[in-house]
Amino acid sequence: MVSIARKNLFEDIPRFVVAQAGIMFAASLVTIQVGIFHGFTRSTAQLIDNSSADIWVSAEEMVYFELTQSMPLERLTEAQAVDGVQRAEAISLSGGRWRSPDGKIAPLRIIGFDPDGTMFRVGEVVAGGFNDLKEPFAFMTDRTNLDSLRLDGLGSTAEVNSAPARLAGLTQGTQSIVSSTMLFTSLENAKAYATSGLTSSVFCDVGAGDGLSCTTTYERRDESDESPPEITALTIADPITHLLIRAEPGQDLEVLKERLANALPDVIVLTQDEMATRTRNYWRLRTGIGFILGLGAAVGMIVGVVIVGQILYSSVSDHIREYGTLKAMGASDRMIYSVIIEQALWMAVLGYIPSLLLCVGLGAWTAATQGIMILITPLT
């Protein structure tokens, strides 16, 4: 029976090549559409996945990683004092305006973190290092952003808001599909970028129970003053966005989450997986782009199945007389079906292998040149 299936496939090579091209197209369509959807979903929480934090602490209004209220830096000290916390680190997120050397502007997402920290890591660093971010107005970005930012390479300078900016490092695979261009820098530099063009003042009060509460206010600076902002250390009133918590070895995370929620006012406490899931669900379920990409993946699968089914049906129909002859010679229905199934398996394998190679190559190219992840998995 195996020889009959092979003979049916290879007796007309031009027809076979056309059929396999159709199957390869259908398989590629499904793989790319589903891969884009999964890659989009993965990229939205990639920075969370790259971190080694056990727990994330954010303002209770937090919707997802980038959409949240700020907290004062004093929450960092309060978190470090909670029993079961081995280490706590802060990160800040703010928006900004990029002005390239030739005067072009673009939106930015400025992410500040502790270069000496151990939990927040931006991914693979391909040029420069985290220590370089300690220098005034130094930043890193994904290497796929160089063209859009109009930068030539390390040492290139531009302007963020009204502050100078110097490229000190490059990362790879860190740019989310749905985010503005991401700039990574130290907390101090991020503060300078976010407040450039502004003057600040701190007001503190002693509240009930003799607790000290401080707030920082900002006012627009005189535009005639073109001097760069001063890099200053953060104060307890300066805003941060998230706290990353590493638990003591053996510490139950659910118990520690409850302690942190009780010790820190107006916060939400999530594990790393919960934070990543919350962010992905927002983009997948609550935005138009998630719906459109999901719909595209579903339609791609349906179209792919229809194309493959039509090709297989056409192949069987072309050999209906041979199957009739086998039936007349006493072949059972099971034997006939085995020939058809064998033929379908050969067509699937011979169409899928080149399709997979094509999709892997395309995924590598888009990741390297555009920073767009097409996630190829065994299921796709």
Residue ranges and their predicted role:
Residues 1-29, 41, 46, 280, ...:
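N-terminal Sec/SRP start-transfer signal
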Residues 19-29, 290-310, 344-351, 355:
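Alpha-helical transmembrane segments of integral membrane proteins
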Residues 20, 24, 28-109, 129-135, ...:
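Hydrophobic, regular-secondary-structure patches
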Residues 55, 146, 201-219, 227-263:
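A short beta-strand structural signal in non-transmembrane regions
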Residues 91-94, 104-114, 121-227:
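Hydrophobic secondary-structure segments that place a key small or acidic residue at a functional site
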Residues 249-252, 257-305, 315-319, 334, ...:
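Peri-transmembrane interface segments
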Residues 300, 313, 317, 321-367:
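Transmembrane alpha-helical interface segments in multi-pass membrane proteins
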Residues 364-380:
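Conserved transmembrane alpha-helices of multi-pass membrane proteins
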